């Protein structure tokens, strides 16, 4: 391509004029068959491009566009990564801010609770400090500077905010030189922190209230221990600040608050129960309260046997001796048995004392034929129409007292079924049947489920039945008729199998109590690991990702023990569990 060929069509056009129309036409017709005619047909001012140059330029343009697209995609990807990183940091900072705000609120509430005379000015100063710090953060952003200045001008600033040298910092971000002394007034956050720690320890110990009731009651009943604990907390305030100042400014929220730690510890703490679901580890049958109540049942059985023997002896004496001698002897023996029962059952002592003064015509007491299990209980006193609002037996109606005296007389003269305070007891029933029922359910001796809510007669109807009862008493007071109606009774001491079964049940209950005592131990041994320490040991394992956390938690729950600080596990058990799960 040359310069002359490019300018030729333009020169030819300028050479031709309107006067030379024939020449131009002839020239145009002559050039129609030549190669120059093709060049003349193109638009003027356009340079003709060769094929190689055009292809090369197209390839360069496409390469440049491709490189631009790659750079744009790479830049967009970097921006997207940066945005996602900033979003995660923002979410983490928001979560941390929310946690710290809640912590400050809890500290203020605890401070108000333990120091109600605290002036409200401190709260307002703290809130003003927080507001000023937020204002400083807004001023650093140019977008919100105008709005922040307008808000600051519309409100009156307090004297605390007017200090320009103030800078709010968290304790772990402060320098050791700037930490206030414990004796100054600015130690209220530290005091509230120690109070919060003390409250947290109390809340943790309350989760195991069923297992460590005695230790907690002792510690809470002595105010000197509480005062000593609070004084030690306040004395360690400076050490707390110095420890927190060594922490880096970057708060590792994920490592400090791992969700898996809380789930693992919540599952492991089920071995000791929780506040919402206090499940004891032992069965309800073997609780100490029930075993303490049922301990003297063997002694009560012996007393019943002695009572039956005394009745038989007194009747034998009545046939050959005067009536007052036999009555005095049996009264003496029965008085001893009642004293033995009253010593074992302190709950029924008042009832025995009140009813002991009422003597029957034969000289026997009302409660001489009443065993410990026939004393008034909730079901008896709570559903009587004459004692709904007065549970004192001395203030009962005269009709009820007369009824009890009449039935007591009937019981003392004959071996017919006796009625004591609404409960029927047949001393002539073979005691082997009672022992067999006791062996089926050793925790509830001689209790019939039908007597849970006895059917009492209305005291208003006792007036109509008084004549029938008097007639029955007169008929039963005949000694000859009593001897005719007498039925043989079988003493309890002649059944060695029952005594062996009772001893076995007592041994089982004692062993259950020992197991409960062994499960409740203080967590002051260095070999016992708390839940957080167990989790640290599990996560530090090199093959942590291969562990079955749920199975490991279930295995450790069976070996966990309850302490005052929560659930603890022996270090050897943790190591054995890790080894067994890695095989």
From Swiss-Prot:
Q: How is it modified after translation?
A: Oxidative stress induces conformational changes through oxidation of cysteine residues, masking the nuclear export signal, thus abolishing nuclear export by CRM1/exportin 1.
One MF term from GO for this chain?
DNA-binding transcription activator activity, RNA polymerase II-specific
Give residue spans, biased composition: Polar residues: 196-207, 316-329
Spans annotated as Leucine-zipper: 79-86
**Would you identify the family this protein belongs to, as annotated?**
Belongs to the bZIP family. YAP subfamily.
The UniProt annotation puts the region (n-CRD) at 265-272
Q: At which positions is motif Bipartite nuclear localization signal?
A: 41-48, 120-127
Q: Where is the composition biased (Basic and acidic residues)?
A: 8-17, 47-58, 67-84
Residue ranges with Basic residues bias: 37-46
Where is the stretch described as Basic motif? 54-77
- The protein's name: AP-1-like transcription factor YAP1
Q: Where is this region: c-CRD?
A: 531-562
Pfam families, sorted: bZIP_1, PAP1
Q: Per the UniProt entry, what species is this protein from, by scientific name?
A: Kluyveromyces lactis (strain ATCC 8585 / CBS 2359 / DSM 70799 / NBRC 1267 / NRRL Y-1140 / WM37) (Yeast)
Which UniProt key words apply to this protein?
Answer: Activator, Cytoplasm, Disulfide bond, DNA-binding, Nucleus, Transcription, Transcription regulation
Q: What is known of its domains?
A: Contains two cysteine rich domains (CRD), referred to as the N- and C-terminal CRD's, n-CRD (Cys-265 and Cys-272) and c-CRD (Cys-531, Cys-553 and Cys-562), respectively. A nuclear export signal is embedded in the c-CRD, with which the nuclear export protein CRM1/exportin 1 interacts only in the absence of disulfide bonds (or otherwise oxidized cysteines) within the c-CRD or between the c-CRD and the n-CRD.
List each copy of the bZIP domain by range: 51-114
State the SMART domains in the record: BRLZ
The entry's localization annotation reads: Nucleus; Cytoplasm
Q: Where is the composition biased (Low complexity)?
A: 24-36, 177-195, 208-230, 297-312
Q: Return the Gene3D superfamilies for the record.
A: 1.20.5.170, YAP1 redox domain. Chain B (1.10.238.100)
Disordered: annotated segments: 1-86, 177-233, 275-329, 350-373
Annotated motif Nuclear export signal: location in the chain? 547-554
Q: Name one GO biological process term.
A: cellular response to stress
